Design a protein with these regions (language model features):
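Acidic, PIN/NYN-like endoribonuclease modules and their adjacent C-terminal/linker elements
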Residues: 91, 98-104, 110-146
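Membrane interface segments of multi-pass transport proteins and intramembrane proteases
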Residues: 55-56
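Short secondary-structure boundary segments
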Residues: 8, 40, 108-110
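Residues that mark the start of a beta-strand
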Residues: 1-3
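Active-site neighborhoods of divalent-metal-dependent phosphate/nucleic-acid chemistry enzymes
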Residues: 71-110
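Short, well-structured alpha-helical segments
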Residues: 59-70
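PIN/NYN-family metal-dependent endoribonuclease catalytic core
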Residues: 5-6, 16, 21-51
Length: 146
């Protein structure tokens, strides 16, 4: 199983476009050949960002996505503070990637990260899906309510 870290923009995109490439990565990371790695700081950012009213997601969809991340994510506690990214808030994704020894950090904003950090490649959802020929059928509703 390949470990990955997902930038918050991938989670947001997955919820806004449930049949897009970010949604495919998200589904694979929650129950496929990929394993989502998450830290407390990353989870807190996911929760804060996807709950913003401008994204217009129902409370049920938000709760379902967060529950799936909590239950199926591989939780790590980074011990090293990094100062690599121009935006200090992005460093937590590299810290998690380093602590979990992930192969890929998937983002929609490649310019926010170095192309590679230690053994972690920073890629888009499309690049990650192509790199391993990963495909998934994403149902109309990725997250079940209840």
């Amino acid at each position: 199983m390949s470990r990955i870290v997902l930038d918050t923009n991938i989670i947001v995109s997955a919820l806004l476009q449930p049949v897009g490439l970010p949604a495919q990565i998200f589904v694979l990371a929650l129950g496929g050949p990929l394993q989502l790695c998450v830290s407390a700081n990353i989870y807190a950012e996911y929760e804060e960002v996807i709950s913003r009213p401008r994204f217009k997601r129902s409370e049920e969809i938000i709760a379902s996505a967060l529950r799936a991340i909590r239950e199926k994510g591989f939780w790590v506690r980074p011990t090293t503070r990094l100062h690599v990214c121009a935006d200090p808030d992005d460093n937590m994704f590299l810290e998690c990637a380093q602590a979990a020894r992930v192969e890929y950090l998937v983002t929609g904003n490649l310019k926010h990260f170095p192309p590679i950090w230690e053994s972690t490649r920073i890629v888009t959802a499309r690049q990650r899906l192509r790199s391993s020929r990963l495909f998934v059928h994403v149902p109309d509703h990725v997250f079940e309510v209840g």
